[in-house]
Amino acid sequence: MDEKQIFQEMVTILKPYVKDPALLENATKDTHILDDLKVNSARLVDVIIKCEDVFDIEIDDDDADQIRTIGDAVNVIQGKLN
């Protein structure tokens, strides 16, 4: 799975957790999950668990702590898939 596919899947995963789905329409790798998309930190944990299920990977606490933007999530996932 390439970076673009992972990014698109991340947008799909984030949709239920974003209060205003329109915010995802112009999302980029630099979009901050907590600040720009208004996902609270408790919901971010749910997003990470969903990523683990969808991509069949395990994201440890150190990797989870690095996830701030959609691009951060893509990089962590890509690293786990390779």
Language-model regions: role of each:
Residues 1-23:
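Thiotemplate assembly-line natural product biosynthesis machinery
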Residues 7-11, 15, 30, 48, ...:
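An amphipathic alpha-helix signature
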Residues 18-36, 54, 58-66:
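Phosphopantetheine carrier-protein modules
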Residues 43:
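Two-component histidine kinase catalytic core, primarily the HATPase_c
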Residues 80-82:
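Juxtamembrane helix-loop boundary signature in multi-pass membrane transporters
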